[in-house]
UniProtKB/Swiss-Prot annotation:
Modified residues (N6-acetyllysine): K262, K735, K756
Function text: Auxillary subunit of N-terminal acetyltransferase complexes which display alpha (N-terminal) acetyltransferase (NAT) activity. The NAT activity may be important for vascular, hematopoietic and neuronal growth and development. Required to control retinal neovascularization in adult ocular endothelial cells. In complex with XRCC6 and XRCC5 (Ku80), up-regulates transcription from the osteocalcin promoter.
Stretch list, region Interaction with HYPK: 500-866
Subunit record text: Component of the N-terminal acetyltransferase A complex (also called the NatA complex) composed of NAA10 and NAA15. Within the complex interacts with NAA10. Component of the N-terminal acetyltransferase A (NatA)/HYPK complex at least composed of NAA10, NAA15 and HYPK, which has N-terminal acetyltransferase activity. In complex with NAA10, interacts with HYPK. Component of the N-terminal acetyltransferase E (NatE) complex at least composed of NAA10, NAA15 and NAA50. Within the complex interacts with NAA10; the interaction is required for binding to NAA50. Interacts with NAAT50.
Classification via SUPFAM superfamilies: TPR-like
Gene Ontology biological-process entries: angiogenesis; cell differentiation; N-terminal protein amino acid acetylation; negative regulation of apoptotic process; positive regulation of DNA-templated transcription; protein stabilization
PANTHER family the record matches: N-ALPHA-ACETYLTRANSFERASE 15, NATA AUXILIARY SUBUNIT, N-TERMINAL ACETYLTRANSFERASE-RELATED
Main location, first listed in the record: cytoplasm
Gene3D superfamilies found in the cross-reference section: 1.25.40.1010, 1.25.40.1040
Effect after changing Y834 to F/A: Reduces NatA complex stability and reduces catalytic activity
PROSITE patterns xref list: TPR, TPR_REGION
Protein name (database record): N-alpha-acetyltransferase 15, NatA auxiliary subunit
């Protein structure tokens, strides 16, 4: 349909529509649209229809908006306004690729439209279409050479494309146009100079970068950045004496910065350990209260010199009462010799302080205050916990608590000792005690909630967090709004442990949405950072966003989700009622009565909680509705609700698992778990070449990893030994690669070789034992013997590995072996007396945990039992 041009009156109204949109006066904009469209001559005016659609989209009426914009576009296909509006609509729905196409169509009809070019450049940088971004920024520079954003955007395009020299030239040309006095300090000009210097450094032009820094030093506001950069550049240019002077100056600014001592070491190049120590001894004299110059030498000293320096360091900290001293020394615990020296010194302090209130009976000087002994005991509790002696650790911390029962840090350490010893429920109880001492401390509150989640006390954890969340909304919803990912990952883990897979997946998907939101949030900074010239931070932001899913929170959520989807594929959820009936069929009358009572109590409790939850939800919905009515600027509709039941009964669990796996394969290639999870998925999909690829990538990271060994045996056995309908090409590739990985052998021999090579490692023995049973179920007895050995000579005979062995005995990885599992549990209980996993049957049922002294539920249950 040919375009209809508006007469002056309607054209003036149309301009008012545009102004209303720009000023977010959407209701007024709709009135003006109605005035134009009510005229029969202009009822189908494309641009007005498009603008009406765009305005409605801003009011949340998405379907109507799309219908109007498409109608407008059909009526005027050659209108840049219609195409631009359609692009804006797609952009609001995060369909950036489609929006880019719309903008390109708009530019066909108005190639020099500044607004469309700017919008296009934003989408290109968002989607990292760097070549396209450079072209668009060049067009903007040609059209508006006087605007600084045009120059800066063009320079950033070259910087991101790693054409540093061109970026530096553009920035220099732009800098020349900036009229600033050499003595005047202007923040934006300062940031421009620092960004220009960063580009020169990344280009490897260190001499030019140093000259640039010295020339414009007076005009740069960030003096610290100038000195730090100068130090790095002088080191790069081997001007070591000058670099040493710079780092000494930086130490005067902040004697507690580790990086300055490292820089000074590089500049002075000490020939031996004594010369290296001399650097720090000078700092002791200069900064007598400095902790870092006393701590860093402990990393490289050994023997008597280490003991001498450590003695001074510990005395200073214990006298002052410095709680984090153990965390400061934690990295030294990799060295057994240093651990022995630490223990000797601190145990000596404790003995001496008890007898004469001095660190050493031969010391001269005034006596130490009683708190010094407290901090020594506090340290010893953490020390023995770290070296795996929880009984001694508990003795020390209990003594400390008896002397000072109001110190929160002591309860925190006691909780940690129980956690590391394997009793997370007792740990949660003690963390709750700590929280009760200071209910206004958010850190303790969060720690307590985290321990409760680890103990699968989800409701209690939610109640704990609710003390610091917004009123009128549920704690869980508010924590999700705040993107509180530590809470959600722990929640997901707890639900997974309780086999509530739907709830766990909901948390994993919520975390996935947070990362999508964080990626989308960068959109606002593309224009803001160029306007404010915060260019260094902006480039760092872009680089961070590119590797965002490397973050541990995402990896943890993805791992939990993949594990659940694999379980759902292996054992799809069935009708729970039928399973429940099968379970109760074998119960005695007394047991059945007890169960029914328990079910009634649980049902009553659930009903009360549901009513409470519904009331909260109604209140929350009222608040949200009010907020929505007040806010006419809301864009887009609500997100799809995550329903646990629906998530747990997904039809294609492996495809869902791949969605979480893909970012890990792209960004977390250095973690072996990424490739082993990939193998587990492709093994179930029978994608042999992808299985092989995963194994090879994992092999390159750690060829002797126990889990990798299991994957290799399964691949070997499935692809080569079992007959499969494989194409000749695939079979040939598999055989060639398998020969490279395994050599001329069979799975059994390969497993035996692996076992001989790693016979002193418990995790490796467990993997080999699983494969012994997998390859030959008749060898079950040998497999169990291999896995359940608890010799002291074995490496990694720790709590975690022993729990994995017990799980393998229960889950069928070593066949049906309940008797062997019970014997192994009893043996492990002697080794790890505090661990819940190895407690006698019925122990957990007898153990009750109350949160902040609330034992009403326990009393009610006891009454019902009677």
């Amino acid at each position: 349909m040919p375009a209809v041009s508006l007469p002056p009156k309607e054209n003036a109204l149309f301009k008012r529509i545009l102004r209303c949109y720009e000023h977010k006066q959407y209701r007024n904009g709709l009135k003006f649209c109605k005035q134009i469209l009510s005229n029969p001559k202009f009822a189908e005016h494309g641009e007005t229809l498009a603008m009406k659609g765009l305005t409605l989209n801003c009011l949340g009426k998405k379907e109507e908006a799309y219908e109007l914009v498409r109608r407008g576009l059909r009526n005027d296909l050659k209108s840049h306004v219609c195409w631009h509006v359609y692009g804006l609509l797609q952009r609001s729905d995060k369909k950036y690729d489609e929006a880019i196409k719309c903008y390109r169509n708009a530019l066909k009809w108005d190639k020099d439209n500044l607004q469309i070019l700017r919008d296009l450049s934003l989408l290109q940088i968002q989607m990292r279409d760097l070549e396209g971004y450079r072209e668009t920024r060049y067009q903007l520079l040609q059209l508006r050479p006087a605007q600084r954003a045009s120059w800066i955007g063009y320079a950033i395009a070259y910087h991101l494309l790693e054409d540093y020299e061109m970026a530096a030239k553009i920035l220099e040309e732009f800098r020349k146009t900036q009229q600033t006095s050499p003595d005047k300090v202007d923040y934006e000009y300062s940031e421009l100079l620092l960004y220009q210097n960063q580009v020169l450094r990344e280009a490897g032009l260190y001499r030019e970068a140093l000259e640039h820094l010295c020339t414009y030093e007076k005009q740069i506001c960030d003096k610290l950045a100038v000195e730090e950069t100068k130090g790095e550049l002088l080191l790069q240019l081997c001007r070591l004496e000058d670099a040493a002077d710079v780092y000494r100056g930086l130490q005067e600014r902040n004697p507690e910065n580790w990086a300055y001592y490292k820089g000074l070491e590089k500049a002075l190049k000490p020939a031996n350990m004594l010369e290296r120590l001399k650097i720090y001894e000078e700092a002791w004299t200069k900064y007598p209260r400095g902790l870092v110059p006393r701590r860093l030498p402990l990393n490289f000293l050994s023997g008597e010199k280490f003991k001498e320096c450590l003695d001074k360091f510990l005395r200073m900290n214990f006298s002052k009462g410095c709680p984090p001293v153990f965390n400061t020394l934690r990295s030294l615990y990799k060295d057994k010799e240093k651990v022995a020296i630490i223990e000797e010194l601190v145990v000596g302090y404790e003995t001496s302080l008890k007898s004469c209130r001095l660190f050493n009976p031969n010391d001269d000087g005034k006596e130490e205050p009683p708190t010094t002994l407290l901090w020594v005991q506090y340290y010893l509790a953490q020390h023995y916990d770290k070296i795996g002696q929880p009984s001694i650790a508990l003795e020390y911390i209990n003594t400390a608590i008896e002397s000072t029962p109001t110190l929160i840090e002591l309860f925190l350490v006691k909780a940690k000792i129980y956690k590391h010893a394997g009793n997370i429920k007792e740990a949660a109880r003690w963390m709750d005690e700590a929280q009760a001492l200071d209910t206004a401390d958010r850190f303790i509150n969060s720690k307590c909630a985290k321990y409760m989640l680890k103990a699968n006390l989800i409701k209690e954890a939610e109640e704990m967090c609710s003390k610091f969340t917004r009123e009128g909304t549920s704690a869980v919803e508010n924590l999700n709004e705040m993107q509180c990912m530590w809470f959600q990952t722990e929640c997901a883990q707890a639900y997974k442990a309780m086999n509530k897979f739907g709830e766990a997946l909901k948390k994993c998907h919520e975390i996935e949405r947070h990362f999508i939101e964080i990626t989308d949030d960068q959109f606002d900074f593309h224009t803001y950072c160029m306007r404010k010239i915060t260019l260094r931070s902006y480039v760092d932001l872009l680089k961070l966003e590119d590797v965002l899913r490397q973050h541990p929170f995402y990896f943890k959520a993805a791992r939990i989700a993949i594990e659940i989807y694999l379980k759902l594929h292996d054992n799809p959820l069935t009708d729970e009622n039928k399973e429940h009936e099968a379970d109760t069929a074998n119960m005695s009358d007394k047991e059945l009565k007890k169960l029914r009572n328990k079910q009634r109590r649980a049902q009553k409790k659930a009903q009360i909680e549901e009513e409470k939850k519904n009331a909260e939800k109604e209140k929350q919905q009222r608040n949200q509705k009010k907020k929505k009515d007040d806010d006419d600027e809301e864009i887009g509709g609500p997100k799809e609700e995550l329903i646990p039941e629906k998530l747990a009964k997904v039809e294609t669990p492996l495809e869902e698992a791949i969605k979480f796996l893909t970012p890990l394969k792209n960004l977390v290639k250095n973690k072996i778990e990424t490739h082993l999870f990939a193998f587990e998925i492709y093994f179930r999909k029978e994608k042999f070449l992808l299985m092989l690829q995963s194994v090879k990538r994992a092999f390159a990271i750690d060829s002797s990893h126990p889990w990798l060994h299991e994957c290799m045996i399964r691949l070997f056995n499935t692809a080569v030994c079992e007959s499969k309908d494989l194409s000749d090409t695939v079979r040939t590739v598999l055989k060639q690669e398998m020969n490279r990985l395994f050599g001329a052998t069979n799975p059994k021999n390969f497993n035996e070789t692996f076992l001989k090579r790693n016979s002193d490692s418990l995790p490796h023995r467990l993997s080999a034992a699983k494969m012994v049973y997998y390859l030959d179920p008749s060898s079950q007895k040998r497999a169990i013997e291999l896995a359940t050995t608890l010799d002291e000579s074995l490496t990694n005979r720790n709590l975690q590995t022993c729990m994995e062995v017990l799980e393998a005995l229960y889950d069928g990885s070593l066949g049906d072996c309940k008797e062997a599992a019970e014997i192994y549990r009893a043996n492990c209980h002697k080794l790890f007396p505090y661990a819940l996993a190895f407690m006698p049957p019925g122990y957990e049922e007898d153990m009750k945990i109350t949160v902040n002294g609330d034992s009403s539920a326990e009393a009610e249950e006891l009454a019902n039992e009677i």
